[in-house]
């Protein structure tokens, strides 16, 4: 989110060169730069001991492609805690180990998605109401089920080679 007005005093922001950061919104009254804001979220490639990945169907996200577990961080929650919570909520699975993979800017939704690989034991899913379906997919079969170039596709490609 780019500030149009100062959140402290309400004055209209002006564009000003701020050091090496470039031209950004600035409040001349409060004398503060108004840094752009974005939502921090996670996306997780959930894998098991059989070289399979959990892919979800969430019709509110896409009616044509599978997706990965994803969610927004809550205040006071670390990225790792968010991954564990989201996997538990969406799939009913317990995470054994986590590895940070990469961050993915998602400008369309003003988000920064932190990508992780989460290792779990293979078991049946207990789906939340926001997940329409989920399945275990062999690594080599996963990419064609995702929208090519999407953040989920990029993460799965990084994790599965």
Language-model regions, residue ranges each:
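N-terminal leader/linker segments that precede catalytic domains of diphosphate-processing enzymes
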Residues: 1-61, 72-124, 161
């Amino acid at each position: 989110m780019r500030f149009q007005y100062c959140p402290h005093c309400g004055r209209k922001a002006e564009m000003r060169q701020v050091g090496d950061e470039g031209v950004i919104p600035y409040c001349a009254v409060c004398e503060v730069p108004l840094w752009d804001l974005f939502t921090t979220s996670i996306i997780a490639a959930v894998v098991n001991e059989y070289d399979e990945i959990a892919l979800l169907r969430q019709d509110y996200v896409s009616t044509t492609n599978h997706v990965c577990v994803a969610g927004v961080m809550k205040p006071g929650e670390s990225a790792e805690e968010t991954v564990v919570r989201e996997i538990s909520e969406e799939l009913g699975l317990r995470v054994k180990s986590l590895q940070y993979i990469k961050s993915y800017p998602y400008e369309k939704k003003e988000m920064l998605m932190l990508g992780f690989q989460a290792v779990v034991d293979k078991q049946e899913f207990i789906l939340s109401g926001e997940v329409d379906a989920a399945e275990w997919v062999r690594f080599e079969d996963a990419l064609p089920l995702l929208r090519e170039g999407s953040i989920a596709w990029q993460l799965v490609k990084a994790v599965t080679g």
